[in-house]
């Protein structure tokens, strides 16, 4: 006999999923999506025009545009880059950011500054959309290697700080984001990237993250 459950709400469904997953072999990253903070982020972003995809292809299958969709992994990568200053880790191990308990708690273990998550995601999406158009000479692999460095640098330029808190991210003025800022940061990051060999290995190294942060400090007033 098979018992079919028809949950009456998203919250009920999430509780059922969590209870079921705890009894089966499910990746920790999949379980993260049912954490209350991610449900709150999804609702908050939806009210502000972004769609936080806790379940793979959920909004894609509803016909939402790619530039409107924010995946859980992408938000984690943006926060890792902007909040923790580790674009190297965002590039090197995107799939494990959510399974690392220490890193996860640093990013999502707070009470939850929903506006900060929204602004980090919005900044990340805008940079990823404009960056390839501004730097048309770059190859796809180069864009993938340095985009989170550019996101980190742009956030620093907008805040005039080389180290950001949740409060700083919440107060980022995205109206000040310009092609000029993106190009300035991208040119600087690309110079560092090429000086270190211009490879994926370089982009995944702490040496590059450290050097880029040093260069960002020189760009700030």
Language-model region placement:
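Active-site beta-strand/loop microenvironment that shapes enzyme catalytic pockets
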Residues: 1
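C-terminal catalytic or substrate-handling cores of phosphate/nucleotide-
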Residues: 6-163
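C-terminal accessory/interaction regions of large nucleic acid-associated machines
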Residues: 149-221
